[in-house]
Structure formats: structure tokens, C-alpha cells
Amino acid sequence: LFFFDLKTGRQYRDTTLTREKFLTDTGAMQTYISNGEYGIVTLANVGHGSTVSAENLGDAAITFPETGADPVFFNRIETPILKGDSLRFDIDLFKSVYKVNVLIEGMQNIDNLEDFYFGLNNYAALNFDNKPCGGFRMYRPRLTRDPAAGTMSGSFYTPYFPSDSPISIG
């Protein structure tokens, strides 16, 4: 949770919550800030390449790990803070995060099943307008392998899933 002072353009405060705390404790974060105009940005489950700061809010990007994203939460609001105000706002799901279920069958006669993977070429990031950005990259989710059944299966989340996206099995 990031607070930006809109008058100075500087970051006022940030708070990090664990996923468990966020999902189980509705009062997980309380903070007191002085009167002023603030931009409030909330992010969760973002990749190491994500960039959020007062200087780059216009072109900040949210990236995802190569194994696919967890469900991604994001919200951005601007509000005046007055003495005695109490804020409550919900963190929304990105509209363009898709869950992809993968089941690959027919691999019973393959000796080296661990050498195979499922891959999806997709955008590397989303911007604050919830639009795909950055170059394409190969997402390789971790799949469970069952050599006896000759299958690989699992689920992962991806930020953007165009209908003509190439799927790679290598």
C-alpha cells in the first residue's frame, strides 16, 4: 500500500502485508496520515521487475514471474484527507488476469518427461491503465508430472491472454 502526497509528489508511506494477512484480516492495515491530497496505490503479488514510485507513476509497470502470476490485486484512488476522516477501499482484481488450466496427455512413452515443459508467449507486464506493456516473454508454469499416467498438469495466472497467443510445448 503506497501513499503519495500529490502536492509534493513524494511518497509518504508504504506498508507491506503478507498474502495470508491480507486475505484473513479485514483490519490488517491501519495508518494515520496528516491532512492533504494523496494518491493511494495498492498492489499485491507482483514480480521483481515491478516499479512503483512517485516519479514514475505515469509509466509504472507491474511484472509477473516467469512461472505465471498469482491472482493480482490492484487499485488506485486519489482523495483529500481531512481531520477525522476514515478511509475504506477495496482492492480489485485486474480484469485482464486469466487463470489457465493445463493438462497435457499422451506422454506415456517418453523416457525423460522432466525435460519437457509447457510455455506461453505473453506480454511481460501491465501498466496502471490495465493494458499490456513490455515485450513478449515465455511463461513456463510449474506443472505436476505423472510419469505413470503420462501427463503434466497444473494451473497458472497470466496478465493478458490474447486469442492468437502462441502456445509452446517443448
Positions of PLM-derived features:
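Tryptophan-paired
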Residues: F2-S50, L113-G170
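Short linear motifs at secondary-structure transitions and domain/linker junctions
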Residues: T15-T18, E66-T67, N75-P80, D92-K95, ...
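Structured interaction patches on ligand/partner-binding surfaces of diverse proteins
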Residues: E20-L23, G47-R88
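Catalytic micro-motifs at enzyme active sites that drive phosphoryl/nucleotidyl and oxygen chemistry
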Residues: A28, R88-D90
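A short, Gly/Thr-enriched small/hydrophobic beta-strand-prone motif that recurs across taxa
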Residues: D92-M107
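Short helix-loop capping/hinge motifs at secondary-structure junctions, enriched
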Residues: N109-D111
